[in-house]
Regions:
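Predominantly a Rossmann-like dinucleotide-binding segment in NAD(P)-dependent oxidoreductases
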Residues: 117, 124-207, 323
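C-terminal helix-rich "cap/oligomerization" subdomain common to oxidoreductases
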Residues: 1-4, 67-70, 113, 291-346
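N-terminal Rossmann-like dinucleotide-binding module
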Residues: 1-49, 345
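Active-site loop of classical SDR/Rossmann-like NAD(P)-dependent oxidoreductases
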Residues: 275-286, 301
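Short, Asp-centered acidic motifs that coordinate Mg2+ and/or phosphate
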Residues: 33, 67, 147
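Contiguous beta-strand/loop segments that form the cofactor/metal-binding neighborhood of enzyme cores
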Residues: 183-257, 283-297, 316, 331-346
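Beta-loop-alpha module in the N-terminal Rossmann-like domain of NAD(P)-dependent dehydrogenases
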Residues: 19, 51-110
Length: 346
């Protein structure tokens, strides 16, 4: 491995370009090439970024590439990620990890077999107020946690693109935006074992995709979590509350707000306000990825984390169709978790 980690960026859309610029700006990484199924888009991106454009297959097979960032439509995640892992490349794949659990499972199994690292891109873990919440919970600031509830969404701005194509995306608002908070719920509370939920197409003409869905999750120790994910959230973006025996945490990212509020049962409150800080979540997430690869540790969220978020979203879809609760944690998940831990140490 050279002094700098050498990257290929596959996918030159909005997120792909954002990731490519982050690679260029980092002192310990180099952008070797970009690729896209639209070759003209790749050429234009390469010109703007001062790098080389190649085909997807060449980017995967290049010997001078250590890591690959995949920012393509969900449908093409497995066909891009698995060959890259098979080549021994460390892979960063945008959330959601896949359209469905079966595809996500194939990707995680490929990572375990290859012993290369698979990371799910999920920058909300690196929001400063989310990081503060994690710190406060680790310090038992709330006492024993009782439940979590939250919502996430936007006004459906992305629906003029492939996001409204069921074959390309695999699911609607709950899989897309919801996977962010599903990941954070697991990060804060542990494994979800069962869920019940409902989905609906309330406003946008995108059926069979949903523009609103709500799920209730039961976690391994009996805690409950509620999530509403929406593409009709006009005052976007995210809000979450965590209640414990001794108090509560409110994580507020509505519009330009970025705060974490710690409240106690005696009525006292402490507000941590990050609203005036420049957004850094993408930079912090990428920096942690680089440090993890250098240290030989699994970057987080892992591929397994990404799989679990997809399973949780799929569980809500199945529950909405059947009218029954959906199990989320069984022997297959336990065996895969153990194999993933053995392969990655995470």
């Amino acid at each position: 491995m050279s002094d700098k980690l050498r990257f290929a960026a596959i996918g030159c859309g909005r997120m792909g370009l954002r990731r490519a610029k982050t690679i260029i700006d980092h002192p310990d990484t180099a952008l070797v090439c970009v690729a896209d199924s639209d070759h003209e888009k790749a050429k234009a991106a390469a010109k703007d970024l001062g790098t080389e454009s190649v085909g997807n297959e060449e980017a995967i097979n290049r010997k001078d590439v250590d890591c690959i960032v995949v920012s393509v439509p969900n449908k093409f995640h497995p066909s891009t990620v698995i060959p890259a892992l098979n080549q021994g490349k460390h892979v960063w794949c945008e959330k959601p990890l896949a359209r469905n659990p079966d595809e996500a499972l194939q990707m995680v199994e490929a990572a375990i077999k290859s012993k290369a690292f698979l990371k799910t891109g999920a920058n909300l873990r690196y929001f400063p107020n989310v990081q503060k919440a994690r710190q406060l919970l680790s310090q038992q600031a709330l006492g024993e946690v009782l439940f979590v509830r939250g919502w996430i969404g936007n006004a459906g701005w992305q629906l003029k693109s492939w996001f409204s194509d069921p074959d390309m995306i695999g699911g609607g608002a709950f899989l897309d935006n919801g996977s962010h908070l599903l990941d954070i719920y697991r990060w804060l509370l542990g494994e979800a074992v069962e869920c019940i939920g409902y989905s609906t197409t309330a406003y946008w003409p995108i059926s069979p995709l949903e523009d609103n869905a709500m799920g209730v999750f039961k976690f391994a120790d009996g805690k409950l979590g509620f999530l509403h994910s929406s593409w009709t959230e006009w005052a976007e973006y995210m809000y979450m509350e965590i209640y414990g025996k001794e108090g509560y945490l409110r994580i507020d990212n509505r519009q330009s707000t970025s705060t974490a509020t710690l409240g106690k049962r005696d009525g006292s409150r402490q507000v941590f306000d990050y609203s005036k800080e420049p957004p850094q979540s993408y930079t912090l997430e990428f920096d942690d990825f680089v440090k993890a690869i250098r240290a030989g540790r699994q970057p987080l969220p892992s591929g397994f984390d990404g799989l679990r978020a997809v399973q949780m979203a799929q569980g809500v879809y199945e529950s909405s169709r059947s009218g029954k609760s959906t199990p989320l944690w069984g022997d297959r998940e336990k065996m895969l978790f153990e194999a993933h831990q053995k392969a990655t140490g995470a």
